Amino acid sequence: PWGYPLLLFPCVVLFGINYFAFKIVGVICLVGAFIFLYYHPILSKERFRMSVLLVLALLTGNIFYWGYVNSVSSELPFFCFLMFSFWTMNKLYALKEQTEKRTILYIGLGILLFFTAQIRTEGYFLFISLIVLQWKNRLLGWRFFLPYASALCIWFVFTLVFPSGYTEHFEHFKVVTLTNLLHNIQTFYEYPAQILYIPFSLFNLFFWVNCLLGLYISSRKLTAESVYLVSTIMLLICWPYDVIRYWLSLFPLCFIFFIQGFRFMCMVWGKKAGKWVLYPIIGILICSVWKVSIKYATSPIQIYTTINPNVEGESAQEMYAFLRTN
């Protein structure tokens, strides 16, 4: 996809191949994602406000997210534009009626969703979220189709201007086996404890049970987010690769539903009793995340490894020169 290269294009024009400038783009995108999450039109309501604040406390101090600032990859830009897309969809469709003043915004929404999908192709699930959101609000009329029409026009321009990839994504499904599916399910099940640095595997069961409960009770309000999350997880289960970075933009949604489900379970015991259970446990999770992140940030780090090579080193520059020549 051409979305991320286009984001880096201004940096290349201004600074050349400067990896520090590329990483600044990652920092801006990560901060931008947090801002869009905080000001989300639905999540900013009283019912979700505490959940969002707790999620941001888990994310802003989590070295898992800040660690991606040190790499030039599409995860953080996609995370930012995904949150921007959710913010825009909920902002436009918070009211059921369509107005002429919003016509240009509906066109812009289609362009935004398409560009997000051009950063990472799982972003195309946003169009499914949009369809469900429009259907839920019973939106009719020609403006209903504007986001799709504008996205289709931009897609046509992209196909004319930019070359396509060497293969199709559907080619990857040819190597999927039942073993892959079972392995992915097991691996994904274990991710929450890894992301939150919890040494107890039983926490994963606790997390996913509450996440599913929160998804069930919050899906009517967070329709677009619920549809996108379920669709993408189903794709990743069937995907032949189990890379944790694919989940970087999904975990904030999982955390929100987890806290919503956990709050509901706690409130079943009574409002006061629930708070005495909810906040200490979430507080322990936040302290665990921040403790590990501070320890990691203050420890000597081996900067260059086989996974994170020195892309500005002499051998790397020789390889780039060879590729440019040939």
What positions do the PLM features span?
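Loop-to-helix entry region of an early transmembrane alpha helix in multi-pass inner-membrane enzymes
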Residues: 2-9, 14-32, 68, 72, ...
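Multi-pass, polyprenyl lipid-linked donor-dependent membrane glycosyltransferases
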Residues: 21-29, 57-84, 89, 115-126, ...
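Transmembrane-helix motifs of polytopic, lipid-linked glycan transferases
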Residues: 24-46, 80, 84, 88, ...
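Transmembrane-helix signature of polytopic, membrane-embedded enzymes
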Residues: 34-61, 79-80, 100, 222-227
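Hydrophobic, aromatic-rich transmembrane alpha-helices
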Residues: 34-41, 130-135, 191-222, 226, ...
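Signature aromatic-anchored transmembrane alpha helix within multi-pass, membrane-resident enzymes
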Residues: 49-54, 102-107, 127, 145-153, ...
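Membrane-interface alpha helices of multi-pass inner-membrane proteins
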Residues: 55-57, 83, 103-120, 127-132, ...
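Membrane-lumen/periplasm interface segments of specific transmembrane helices
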Residues: 117, 142-211, 236, 251, ...
